[in-house]
């Protein structure tokens, strides 16, 4: 898929030529899962799979929206006068949410837009299709209406849409990775301070393979909110005995010394993941900088174990992929990525072994789960941008 596909689709739907094209990537997180709302570090990168848009003007004072990913929905009109109406339960809620947040922040929509959208991110796969759409919309509206918003402002607008409009208490990682991504680099982001640095992803003879369970993350939103609530409860218990603003501020030793303040075994497990995952992320980013891929792979795998047993956000599909991935020749590490409860896992695989890896893991998954997983070699890409 490329911009030509959406310009053709635009003409078919709206009967005229598109004037602009845009792209926003998806993302994978190398390590640092469920740490972004706990004041910890994350280490994501944008990928070449993503969401495209072709855009043209109209004189109707409305956004006229079509997505090739939801063809049965057809064209949806959102008049400017309806921007602050309730959400409709459609994909257009993300467009409407971004538009209303930007309008509140001072954006001036001087004319209508026809927008044709098509993406190649599998829906519900945990590669951040919703954040990709939010950053795509933010880039479109900021570019075409001279909004003047900085990239980090668009990131915060996207988080606000998720939290206040869609109803998912997500952190900042997805929107940040998609808006701020750079080709062949991952971003080490301290979500507590929003300080970040770009680090080259140099894998030598290895590649990152994305493994899609093809199980939609149907429970992810409710369980995501539940995990965040559990971490907040654990933090509140710790704060009764020590001065700490977020779980991400604690070292492993500091956490171990103060677990007596958390008198719930489930909450201890949740908080332990947040604390230890943050430290793993710092160690992993340093290992990658040092070219120590063996250590990097071990830390990635350790993250997966913690997500399965302390945070409990995997499930049989992800566990089957990761367990079988780690049995294969040429694999340095593997774990789930994203919110969990379905979606995707990643593996670091020697490029010479990728074909056998996909065959073997795919066969084992089919035999265990009853349907196919899909595999993609990740291409680390730039963030959201206008293409023409």
Curated annotation (Swiss-Prot):
Matching InterPro entries: Galactokinase, Galactokinase_bac, Galactokinase_CS, GalKase_N, GHMP_kinase_C_dom, GHMP_kinase_C_sf, GHMP_kinase_N_dom, GHMP_knse_ATP-bd_CS
Main location: cytoplasm
Reaction catalysed by this enzyme: alpha-D-galactose + ATP = alpha-D-galactose 1-phosphate + ADP + H(+)
Protein keywords: ATP-binding, Carbohydrate metabolism, Cytoplasm, Galactose metabolism, Kinase, Magnesium, Metal-binding, Nucleotide-binding, Transferase
Superkingdom of source: Bacteria
Localization annotation: Cytoplasm
Keyword Nucleotide-binding: yes
Pfam families linked: GalKase_gal_bdg (PF10509), GHMP_kinases_C (PF08544), GHMP_kinases_N (PF00288)
Active site: 174 (proton acceptor)
Protein name (Swiss-Prot/TrEMBL): Galactokinase
């Amino acid at each position: 898929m490329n911009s030509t596909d959406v310009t053709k689709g635009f003409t078919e739907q709206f009967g005229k030529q598109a004037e602009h094209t845009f792209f926003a990537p998806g993302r994978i997180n190398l390590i640092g899962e469920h740490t972004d709302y706990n004041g910890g570090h994350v280490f994501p990168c944008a990928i070449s799979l993503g969401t495209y848009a072709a855009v043209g003007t109209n004189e109707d004072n409305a956004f006229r929206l079509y997505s090739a990913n939801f063809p049965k929905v057809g064209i949806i009109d959102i008049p400017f006068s309806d921007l602050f109406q309730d959400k409709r339960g459609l994909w257009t809620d993300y467009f409407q949410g971004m538009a209303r947040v930007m309008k509140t922040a001072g954006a001036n929509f001087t004319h209508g837009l026809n927008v044709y959208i098509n993406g190649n991110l599998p829906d519900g796969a945990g590669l951040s299709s919703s954040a990709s759409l939010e950053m795509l919309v933010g880039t479109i509206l900021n570019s075409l209406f001279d909004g003047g918003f900085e990239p980090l402002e668009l990131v915060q607008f996207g988080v606000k849409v998720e939290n206040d409009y869609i109803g998912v208490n997500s952190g900042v990682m997805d929107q940040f990775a998609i808006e701020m991504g750079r080709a062949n680099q991952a971003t080490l982001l301290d979500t507590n301070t929003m300080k970040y640095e770009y680090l080259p992803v140099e894998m030598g003879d290895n590649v990152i393979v994305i493994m899609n369970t093809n199980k939609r993350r149907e429970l992810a939103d409710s369980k995501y909110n539940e995990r965040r609530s559990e971490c907040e409860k654990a933090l509140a218990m710790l704060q009764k005995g020590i001065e700490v603003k977020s779980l991400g501020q604690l070292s492993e030793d500091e956490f171990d010394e103060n677990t007596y303040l958390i008198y719930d075994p489930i909450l201890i497990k949740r908080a332990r993941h947040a604390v230890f995952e943050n430290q793993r992320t710092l160690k992993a980013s340093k290992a990658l900088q040092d070219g120590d891929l063996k250590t990097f792979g071990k830390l990635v795998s350790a993250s997966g174990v913690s997500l399965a047993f302390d945070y409990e956000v995997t499930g049989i599909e992800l566990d089957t992929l990761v367990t079988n991935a780690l049995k294969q020749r040429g694999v340095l590490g593997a774990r789930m990525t994203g919110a969990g409860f379905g979606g995707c896992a990643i593996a670091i695989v020697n490029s010479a072994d990728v074909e056998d890896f996909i065959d073997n893991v795919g066969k084992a998954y089919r035999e265990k789960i009853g349907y196919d997983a899909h595999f993609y070699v990740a291409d680390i890409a730039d963030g959201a941008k206008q293409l023409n």
